[in-house]
């Protein structure tokens, strides 16, 4: 799967920023839980959003996240999102995509979730997001909640 994710990351990174209404980068951290176990998680993401209409947008992001546990590695993700502007400073969205395996014995998984971004000062924003990971292959699904801070360009 890495053969597909890395070219996608590169293509988004080199996409013409002038076409984007909202290019952003963020750092985030939170918790991920599965099967009665909760661990910390942290990472970073970069993405672009495009206005579809005055109050709706769609976009995509690439990410790298790490579960704070020995034996895990960076999990890379590609996510699409669609949302509404709930005012001049707030975005509410649903998201879905794919995340690579977070450990050598794990598998990559599809994910879906929802979140909110709130502008706080100039280009800075705060973000909260929930994701459900559809793990499959007899491995219990997992869930995460993260908060982050980002900057729009």
Give the residues covered by each predicted segment.
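Cleavable N-terminal export/targeting peptides
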Residues: 1-24
């Amino acid at each position: 799967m890495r053969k597909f994710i890395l070219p996608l990351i590169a293509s988004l990174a080199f996409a013409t920023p002038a076409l984007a209404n909202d290019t952003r980068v963020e750092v985030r951290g939170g918790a991920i839980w599965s099967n009665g176990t909760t661990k910390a998680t942290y990472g970073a993401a970069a993405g672009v959003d495009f206005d579809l209409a005055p109050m709706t947008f769609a976009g995509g992001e690439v990410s790298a996240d790490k579960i704070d546990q020995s034996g895990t590695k960076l999990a890379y993700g590609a996510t699409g999102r669609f949302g509404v502007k709930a005012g001049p400073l707030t975005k509410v969205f649903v998201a879905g995509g794919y995340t690579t395996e977070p450990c050598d014995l794990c598998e990559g998984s599809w994910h879906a979730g929802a979140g909110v971004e709130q502008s706080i000062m100039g280009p800075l924003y705060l973000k909260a997001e929930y994701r459900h990971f559809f793990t499959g292959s007899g491995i219990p699904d997992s869930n995460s909640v993260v908060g982050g801070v980002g900057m729009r360009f």
